[in-house]
């Protein structure tokens, strides 16, 4: 929805004024794209152990897209332009306003539930348009396409009943058969409530949804780490909402980090969850995958307790893993490759 704090939150993420923030609808027209560091305290600890010259965190890309209004599926507001932009992202981060402020322009009353339903309905309507065209296409009517047609028909019924595709598609097989339809409601979704700084939900453990005060996060992003910590303490907030958001987005994308550390740098490397050791080595350098021999691995906690590779090895905490090893988040690794 327009004027709910998306661009304020986006700018806080990037710690600079990149997206236009204005008190009128559709201040954002073209998408703003920013690459954000993934908070990872483990890198600071590893850097101290290894006396690293630098720290290189993992990153995730955020896109600030124009607000959607009722009727977007048929062209209202920025309509099809918005929907084209959202089709290009992997996870939808939906921001809804849940605070009162008479100075901020907003159509209707403050009702996050209704705002969420408006957005979800428009995405469902657009997907219905896609599915209707698919049902009429020769591809799903062709011989041998019975499974694909069954999934499309299932989607048509589910979407008509108001269910998003992510709920309708229950199995991995269904999701794979529907992949080339590029459905908007098949994407994973994170719901963020933009609340006031006095809202008690900011001070409670976060559940499935996130409660963030974009105004506070904007202020925190302009402060030094020490001043930001003091301000959060004053507000009674234990953890930055942005840190929670970034980590949740990273996990929702199905990503994890393995870690490398040495005098030159301590670094988090981004891989897909479930990736095997040779493919992970290939993220560092393509030749490493081809010439992979084995991976020297230590659990992060054990590595820190041992204060480095030598003692970890002496204590028997270092493992040598082969080509079938599935990487885990927080693995501290050195890859052994052939010449």
Model-derived features: where do they sit?
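Conserved G1/Walker A P-loop phosphate-binding module
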Residues: 1-103, 113, 120-122, 131
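Solvent-exposed, flexible loop/coil residues
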Residues: 25-33, 40-42, 47-53, 59, ...
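Short, surface-exposed linear patches
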Residues: 32, 56-59, 82-86, 93, ...
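C-terminal-of-GTPase-core extension/linker across diverse P-loop GTPases
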Residues: 1-4, 10, 137-328, 333-339
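Phosphate/Mg2+-binding loops and adjacent switch elements
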Residues: 73-190, 200
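Generic signal for short, ordered secondary-structure residues
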Residues: 8, 25, 61, 110, ...
């Amino acid at each position: 929805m327009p004027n709910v704090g998306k661009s304020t939150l986006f700018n806080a993420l990037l710690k600079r004024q990149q997206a236009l923030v204005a008190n009128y609808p559709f201040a954002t027209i073209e998408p703003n794209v920013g690459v954000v560091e993934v908070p990872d305290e483990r890198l600071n600890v590893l850097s101290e152990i290894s006396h690293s010259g630098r720290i290189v965190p993992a990153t995730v890309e955020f896109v600030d897209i124009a607000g959607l209004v009722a009727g977007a599926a048929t062209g209202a507001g920025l309509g099809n332009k918005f929907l084209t932009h959202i089709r290009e992202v992997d996870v939808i981060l939906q921001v809804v306003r849940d605070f009162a402020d008479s100075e901020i322009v907003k159509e209707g009353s403050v009702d996050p539930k209704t705002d969420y339903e408006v957005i979800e309905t428009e995405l469902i309507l657009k997907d219905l348009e896609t599915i209707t065209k698919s049902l009429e296409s020769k591809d799903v009517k062709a011989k041998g396409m019975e499974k694909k047609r069954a999934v499309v028909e299932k989607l048509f019924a589910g979407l008509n009943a108001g269910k998003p595709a992510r709920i309708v598609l229950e199995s991995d097989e269904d999701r794979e058969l529907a992949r080339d339809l590029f459905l908007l409601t098949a994407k994973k979704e994170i719901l963020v409530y933009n609340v006031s700084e006095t809202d008690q939900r900011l001070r409670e453990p976060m559940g499935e949804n996130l409660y963030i005060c974009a105004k506070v996060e904007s202020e925190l992003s302009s402060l030094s780490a020490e001043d930001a910590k003091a301000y959060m303490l004053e507000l009674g907030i234990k953890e930055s909402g942005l840190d929670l958001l970034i980590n949740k987005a990273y996990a929702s994308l199905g990503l994890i980090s393995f870690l490398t550390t040495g005098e030159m740098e301590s670094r988090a490397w981004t891989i897909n969850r479930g990736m095997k050791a040779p493919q992970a080595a290939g993220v560092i350098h393509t030749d490493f995958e081809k010439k992979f021999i084995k991976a020297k691995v230590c659990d992060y906690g054990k590595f820190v307790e041992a204060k480095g590779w030598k003692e970890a090895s002496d204590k028997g905490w270092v493992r040598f893993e082969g080509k079938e090893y599935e990487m885990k988040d927080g693995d501290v690794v050195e890859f052994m490759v052939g010449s």
